C-alpha cells in the first residue's frame, strides 16, 4: 500500500468524480482508477461503489477513508516536525473560525507569523458544523469556535475569551442615554441582527426569550460586516459581541449601551483534534494564544469604549450586568 493510493482515495471522496479527482492529483483518470483498484486488492475489500459514474464509497471504503485521512495528516505532521529540526517552523497552518470570531483572529495570526517567519496561514470562515467536520477529516489544523458546542466531538480546547454583549444604537435613540438596557427594550428598536442560523443569533434569541419577548429584526445578515454596513445611517440598532469592537469599533453617530443580563457569556476558544502528537503548527499557535492575552486585550478595548460613552463606573467590569 502506497501513500499515493491513499491520496487518490481522499481526492475521489472529496471530488466525487473520477475525472476531477485525477485532475486534482495531476494524473490520468486510468492511473487513478488503477491505483484505487490495487488498493482494494491489497486490502481485500471493496472501497468504491461503481456504476456508470462514481456512486460513493462502500461501508468498508468509508472506514478506509478515515484511516487514509489520518495517515496523510500524520505524514504532514512528521514533515513539519522534521522541518523544525532542520531550521525552524515552516509550512501552512490551516485555521478555521466561526464568522463572529473572525474580527479577533488577527490577535493570534499576526504574532504567530511574526514569530515563525517561514510559516503561512490559510484562514477560512466556517460554521461550527463545518469546523467539526473538517477537524474530523484532518482538513483543519485548528479552529476558533464556541467551546460549549455539543457537536465538537473529541477535541482539545484552549479558552480565549467570553462573549459580552452590548447594544449599538444611534445617539438620538431612546435607549442611548440609559445606564443599562434590557433585552425587552432592545426588541422594540428598529433592529438589524445576525441570521437565525448563526449560533450567535440563537444565543441572543435565548436572552430575548428569557426577558419575555421575541426580536423581529427588519434586516438579517450572515456576516458581522453586513450588520455594520447598516449602522451609519442613524436609524438601525444592533446587538454586538464586544469582540467585534477590535475590528469595527463604534461607528460615528452611534453609542454603546450595556445590557442587563448574565454576567458570563459563552466561551470562545481554540480547538484542535484530540490526537497525539499534536500537529506542530497547531501547537505553535496554541503557544502564541497562551501569551497573546486575547481576553485582556478585548476587555481593555471594551473599557475604552464604555468610558468614551460615559460608563466609567461600568468599565473594567462585565459588560452584561445581572439582575
Q: What are these model-predicted stretches?
A:
Residues 1-35, 51, 55, 64-65:
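N-terminal short secondary-structure element
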Residues 29-30, 34, 80, 86-116, ...:
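N-terminal winged-helix
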Residues 40-62:
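A short LG(V/I)-centered, amphipathic sequence patch enriched
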Residues 70, 85, 107-113, 122, ...:
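Short beta-strand-centered segments that line the small-molecule binding cleft or hinge
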Residues 104, 146, 176, 181-182, ...:
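Secondary-structure junction motif
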Residues 127-140, 146, 197-257, 305-307, ...:
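Hydrophobic hinge/microswitch elements
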Residues 154-191, 282:
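Flexible hinge/capping segments at coil-to-helix
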Residues 242-253, 261-323:
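C-terminal effector-binding regulatory domain of bacterial HTH transcription factors
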